[in-house]
């Protein structure tokens, strides 16, 4: 595990089928350039929660385009459980999930540009409108609220959940995480290791 890509070369990084980003993204220029090259050449990425956080101070247009969403807009606080609804069962990441489930407590991020409005994005799960208003200190009152999606131009999945340990203990959510990991790895240009 690492919190930076400094010290890695592209030849080293391309040997990995997937980068799992738990609540962080590359912040220094060297790491950003390496991550861009890795993803533009078929790399895989599974991002959780704050790994997608970006605001006007992030200054990384490529990453915003890669994520398929705009800058951070709002969040609920404190973390709370939420009803999530599956957008499609046609995608391998959601094929065996229930139509809806209650996710463990998390802080959910909402974006200035909705991922669903991006032609390159396929939304897989959405926070149900039944949750509104959501929060106590910081309140989200409504709006379209995708929480899991893929940018179809890349081998990537973003998962909004992951604010604390509880996010990783729910059976339905564990299945979502496992499906996402397997889907990304199975599409590796080097071949599907699960077929061996």
Map each language-model feature to its residues:
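Extracellular ligand-binding/catalytic regions of CAZymes and related secreted enzymes
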Residues: 130-147, 151-196
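Aromatic-Pro/Gly-enriched surface loop or interdomain linker
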Residues: 1-17, 181, 189-191, 195-196
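Catalytic beta-strand/loop cores that center a nucleophilic Ser/Cys/Thr
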Residues: 77-153
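Short beta->alpha connector loops
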Residues: 4-6, 24-27, 129-130
